[in-house]
Amino acid sequence: MKVLLTNDDGFHATGIKVLKEIIIESGIASEVWIAAPASNCSGYGRSIGVKTATDVYQIGDTEFIVNSTPSTSAFLGLREITGKKPDLVLSGINSGINVGNDIGYSGTIGAAAEGAMMNIPSIAISQEYDGKHGEINWINPQKFLKKIINMLLEVPFWNKSTIMNVNFPLVPAKGIKFTSQGEYIPSNKIEKKRNVSGSISYTVHRIAPDKGNRGYSDDSIKAIDDGYITITPLKLDMTDFDALESLIALYKDCTI
């Protein structure tokens, strides 16, 4: 099996190094390729560089640094860098979970979406991190990711245009739960600074609510808080079909 690894934390991030080690040691793939951004691109979502030249630096036989966004990195990795199309795309391991409404900002999800657009099984992988306990502990993905990947690849009804979004909790995992995305909404802190030039600089900080104060129901956020690994299927087609049917029914006689 040929696997493409990508991420949004950047080529030099620990998470993608851990992911590479897991895939090599597990024997899941015979070929492991990496195409990842030159620097941290968290929050870049699905932005892609078009009509601009993108520099790509080859580091090893199958490892490439892309001077662009996560989606551009995956796009070039899939269509140019790897040659023959990979059998699997793994995006991560992200430092911090990707759940709730924050998913729309996620470069980890955005990079995985490039694989899903080509009907390649694509998995986004994230590790919870609260910034309060020093180094990130990767023990959960190191213990369980191989099993999860093999399990998902055996799913007979997996529509390959669906991204599998996997999140690992901060604490030792109690098990796995299949969950919905949820409605997790962080608060924002905006720092404002006036520059000598006369311009104003704004720095946005996303602040996660304390556990127990997130306003969730039985979704991926609650499962993570309860110590479970979560797996959430995400569709590329964002159509609200209930609303679509209602609009068609409401305006069935609409004319212009």
UniProtKB/Swiss-Prot annotation:
Cofactor note: Binds 1 divalent metal cation per subunit.
Subcellular location: Cytoplasm
Cofactor(s) listed: a divalent metal cation
Pfam families: SurE (PF01975)
Record's keyword annotation contains Hydrolase: yes
An MF annotation (GO) of this entry: metal ion binding
Catalytic activity annotation: a ribonucleoside 5'-phosphate + H2O = a ribonucleoside + phosphate
Residues annotated to bind a divalent metal cation: 8-9, 42, 94
Superkingdom assignment: Bacteria
NCBIfam families assigned to the protein according to its UniProt record, in alphabetical order: surE
Entry's family note: Belongs to the SurE nucleotidase family.
Function of the protein: Nucleotidase that shows phosphatase activity on nucleoside 5'-monophosphates.
Protein name from the UniProt record: 5'-nucleotidase SurE
Organism field: Ehrlichia canis (strain Jake)
